[in-house]
Curated annotation (Swiss-Prot):
It holds the Pfam family ThiC-associated. Belongs to the ThiC family. It comes from the Bacteria. Gene3D superfamilies: 6.10.250.620, Radical SAM ThiC family, central domain. This is Phosphomethylpyrimidine synthase. Disulfide bonds: none annotated. Substrate binds at N239, M268, Y297, H333, S353, R354, G355, D394, G395, L396, R397, E433, Y460. The keyword Transcription regulation does not apply. The lineage of its organism: Bacteria, Pseudomonadati, Pseudomonadota, Gammaproteobacteria, Enterobacterales. It comes from Escherichia coli O139:H28 (strain E24377A / ETEC). InterPro entries: ThiC (IPR037509), ThiC-associated_dom (IPR025747), ThiC/Bza_core_dom (IPR038521), ThiC/BzaA/B (IPR002817). Zn(2+) binds at H437, H501.
Amino acid sequence: MSATKLTRREQRARAQHFIDTLEGTAFPNSKRIYITGTHPGVRVPMREIQLSPTLIGGSKEQPQYEENEAIPVYDTSGPYGDPQIAINVQQGLAKLRQPWIDARGDTEELTVRSSDYTKARLADDGLDELRFSGVLTPKRAKAGRRVTQLHYARQGIITPEMEFIAIRENMGRERIRSEVLRHQHPGMSFGAHLPENITAEFVRDEVAAGRAIIPANINHPESEPMIIGRNFLVKVNANIGNSAVTSSIEEEVEKLVWSTRWGADTVMDLSTGRYIHETREWILRNSPVPIGTVPIYQALEKVNGIAEDLTWEAFRDTLLEQAEQGVDYFTIHAGVLLRYVPMTAKRLTGIVSRGGSIMAKWCLSHHQENFLYQHFREICEICAAYDVSLSLGDGLRPGSIQDANDEAQFAELHTLGELTKIAWEYDVQVMIEGPGHVPMQMIRRNMTKELEHCHEAPFYTLGPLTTDIAPGYDHFTSGIGAAMIGWFGCAMLCYVTPKEHLGLPNKEDVKQGLITYKIAAHAADLAKGHPGAQIRDNAMSKARFEFRWEDQFNLALDPFTARAYHDETLPQESGKVAHFCSMCGPKFCSMKISQEVRDYAATQTIEMGMADMSENFRARGGEIYLRKEEA
């Protein structure tokens, strides 16, 4: 934890410096590689960790080495992870998907924005200094057309996005030759179907069935295609966003880049303060990952924070505004029905979802049904025109383990299942949001009920937190639940930072939350038996046993922390080649002793074998050549 607290001005200045000096950066001893596909422009980025050779014998003067294969890993950092790419935040990222979108011929550019709010913002000269300079001309579907990846999948079309994803999900594991690295324990998949090789056709089939989504708004061409579904790698979302009391555009862009560097598969912009529209534009134009939002937050800002004053018209305008900026998925709390609100009265912590509480208050104040539920088909029509995926929000999720798995939570889940089928009528992609606070023994029921009632649509959960006693450490309490529900079939995990329940996370909190959740997601992939998931673990274990310290650092999810902890006690360069660490020292290192035992056993076997042969030779009379019948 930092000893000195920066002022707001210092925080903004530091973030501005980060943006101004930003350049593509690789992790230590890693390089960016690209694997090409058959579609034009399909060039899938991965990070390849270079490893040092293993000493296998020889003398001090002439040592003999065996090369170790480089390890390819999934990389979410986009252009920010490629030192060869010039980064300019003022101009935004290259529009990777634009040629694919244009080639389909089913979209048209808008000459006028559909949102009245957007028109007003663009006409306000006072915002010129804040506004992103290269504003994208938005597109929407041509009349009578649907432009969603679900629509294409149902038509039997394999899009470039689907091929990109198939290559990405395989993680280059076909390159690995070593049997030691390829070894993997059988998993327990709880009904998930995990093919040995993921093909573009498999991706298409999963999307067509609604079991997976590809969040890819046609107005966010900068994003690199990714997929969310239980038959693929478990994904992690990071939340960023300003508030009414803290943060700035510079800091949010910095957090975006930081999040993608540390493994965020998607990022949600939960801004609730000033300049939400402008902040989101900067984020989208510089994001290589899908961006999600909760539109009700901004709609509430438009009515001065008074939930009772919300209207469908204001909300619809917000959907159009965000869809034309390029938001890839909306969290919509359409399952908070008027009749469910009384079910929360006996809860210890009531309704803890911001979106859920806003809609509950609106329902009660008007004594009318949730307008998001009433206008859900119109919401779907908007999403189908831009390919905005729906993340159906769990507004009645439990906010304490006492309230876990209660009547209100599962009543809403049933409704989300009904809404899923309606969205699919419009070829709109859907995932389902889940809890929350759930003790370990009650977690699996959440997954089984979601699969049953929501027709196997992907599940996306916040944790869940497995205990309520650890403010400041809720990335741990929730990481436990996240690993479990990921194993049971959850497709994406929303990270929790150390600041959960305490305050808005800063840059370091974002990193801590992401590392915790990347661990949880990877542990779930291992437990499910996802093909190739164990390769990196095997490489790490081999490096550890062979005392290849640099390789251990570089294979870690966080190489910098691993190196720093090692160097606290063994900072000298000699410590990087030592056959021990400070935990046990040179005399009691279990791996060093194991190596000695292995070497001793091998030597003994050879010596015993030679002794046996010598004795046999003497027993046969010491003759060099034996008669055929004696041989």
